[in-house]
A protein has these predicted regions:
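Acidic/His/Gly-enriched intrinsically disordered linker/tail segments
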Residues: 172-181, 185-266
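Generic hydrophobic alpha-helical segments
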Residues: 11, 104, 205-206
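Preference for long, solvent-exposed alpha-helical segments and helix-linker "stalks"
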Residues: 34-44, 58-64, 69
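Acidic, low-complexity proline/glycine-rich segments
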Residues: 49-64, 235-239
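Carboxylate/His-rich catalytic cores and anion/metal-binding grooves
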Residues: 31-51, 94-101, 106-127, 214-229
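Juxtacatalytic substrate-recognition/specificity segment
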Residues: 4, 60-190
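Mid-sequence acidic-hydrophobic segments that form the walls
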Residues: 7, 100, 204
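Extended, low-hydrophobicity, Ser/Thr/Pro/Gly-biased non-transmembrane segments
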Residues: 1-53
Length: 268
């Protein structure tokens, strides 16, 4: 077992008046700490410890329930987003995914950690949470129409993608990722399945949950197909090789990448 103490930052660089409103957002098990508070947290082992990201600072926090499972979102960064709209849409997406698998959710709670920046996009799945980054303008506006904007649709798709990984990657995973060597890249030929299948379903769950309509989904699907057909590398690299070479090619792109690499997200 691992027990850690998260202390409130102090010192000349971070005077108390600057950190007095700081809170802690994580799904680590509390071992004496109050909800959102500094103090003791614990994990069963090191693997569990590093799979629970921690957000420290001033953030907006909204809790909500999905099929009896506590969920929450912590948003860090200046924004003018309509958080009520975001929470309502997330509830629909999450509920649709849980019911899709026809079994209880594989976690006791879930946390979306969202960092809002001027320009950025991405996410990483964890066993009961996800770390996300998005553009400030991607958040829904106060007068967001029923049909989400392009940026907001992209954000919802990202949330849907990482949430689906709770099943497809965190529960179902390649054998080399069950007990991975964290000192070096771990290679597998199956990323096309774990990322490709997830990418197929992320936007589809926006449709299934009613967050977007059929026309909006068809547009997203056509954009992905067009992106794939316009990539010459689709006729050069196999999905297995694309998966295996992710560390050395897909994430180290150069001017020739489109000619020799195919996306295991899109084609998968």
């Amino acid at each position: 077992p691992v027990t850690i103490t998260i202390e409130q930052p102090q010192g000349a660089e971070l005077p108390l008046e600057k950190t007095g409103e700081w809170r802690v957002a994580t799904t680590l098990t509390r071992a004496g700490a109050e909800p959102l508070g500094f103090g003791d947290y614990c994990a069963a082992n090191y693997d569990e410890l590093i799979d629970h990201p921690v957000e420290l600072g001033v953030f907006d926090y909204e809790a909500f329930d999905v099929d009896g499972v506590p969920h929450a979102i912590a948003i860090t960064g200046t924004h003018r987003g309509n958080i009520s709209r975001l929470v309502n849409d997330l509830k629909r997406i999450c509920a649709t995914q849980i019911r899709f698998f026809e079994e209880p959710a594989p976690f006791n709670e879930y946390l979306f950690l969202l960092r809002v920046v001027d320009s950025g996009y991405g996410g990483l799945e964890h066993r009961s949470s996800t770390s996300l980054i998005c553009n400030r303008d991607d958040l829904p506006s106060a007068n967001e129409p029923n049909a989400p904007s392009v940026g907001y649709t992209q954000l919802l798709g990202l949330c849907s993608h990482e949430y689906f990984h709770s099943w497809n990657v965190k529960r179902l995973k390649p054998d080399v990722m069950v007990t991975p060597n964290l000192r070096q890249p771990v290679h597998t030929e199956l990323l096309w399945f774990f990322e490709g299948i997830t990418s197929y379903y992320d936007d589809q769950f926006l449709l299934r949950s009613g967050v977007i309509n059929v026309d909006a989904y068809a547009k997203l699907l056509s954009q992905n197909i067009t992106r794939h057909l316009q990539t010459p590398g689709r006729a050069v690299q196999t999905l297995a090789n694309s998966s295996f070479d992710a560390w050395t090619k897909y994430y180290q792109q150069n001017e020739n990448t489109p000619n020799v690499v195919v996306s295991y997200y899109v084609k998968g």
